[in-house]
A protein has these predicted regions:
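Interface amphipathic segments
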Residues: 1-167
């Protein structure tokens, strides 16, 4: 038996068009998923690792207006439109340990959609460590460092060049 994380129930009604190749606990999924929280496209290998009792994954994902805030259960975060390569494990924000390299066309945060974001970093134990470049009309930023989401408020340890910030 494989337990489905509670946050995946937030997907609501799901329509997947694509193919699964492999076994129930080790497969490649490629196709498109429409759900109550948005659209995802994936070409990803997903394995259930019984030692860690979680999923291990590697591949390419893209999304269109996908409500990552609802799935990750982060109130200030909204929808994301992105294309990224990911290599990691864990499907819950609390347990994810993944490397992410991608381009984020749009990311909602505190009721504003930031655009043109490049990300290259790792997410583990509610901690982001990496580089972020933002070329948004309201934010021009080069960021390198850490953001710790473990507490009520994020804790930052970083170096940044901020050319424009109209927040």
């Amino acid at each position: 038996t494989i337990d489905v994380p509670e946050n995946l129930e937030d997907l609501g009604l799901v329509d997947f068009k694509g193919k699964f190749t492999g076994f129930f606990s080790d497969f490649v999924a490629y196709g498109n998923l429409n759900s109550d929280v948005g659209y995802l496209s994936a070409d990803i290998n997903l394995k259930y690792d019984s030692r860690i009792k979680d999923y291990v994954y590697k591949g390419h994902v893209s999304s269109n207006h996908f409500d990552i805030g609802k799935i990750a259960r982060i109130g200030d975060m909204g929808q994301v439109t992105l294309a990224a390569d990911i290599d990691g494990k864990g499907l819950r924000f609390e347990t994810v340990d993944a490397r992410l390299i991608g381009n984020i066309q749009s990311l909602g945060f505190k009721n504003y959609a930031y655009s043109n974001i490049k990300v290259n970093g790792e997410i583990a134990k509610k901690l982001f460590n990496g580089k972020v470049n933002v070329q948004d009309p309201n934010l021009d930023l080069d960021f390198e460092g850490k953001i710790n989401f473990q507490g009520k408020l994020p804790i930052f340890d970083f170096t940044a060049a901020i050319k424009r910030a109209h927040l």
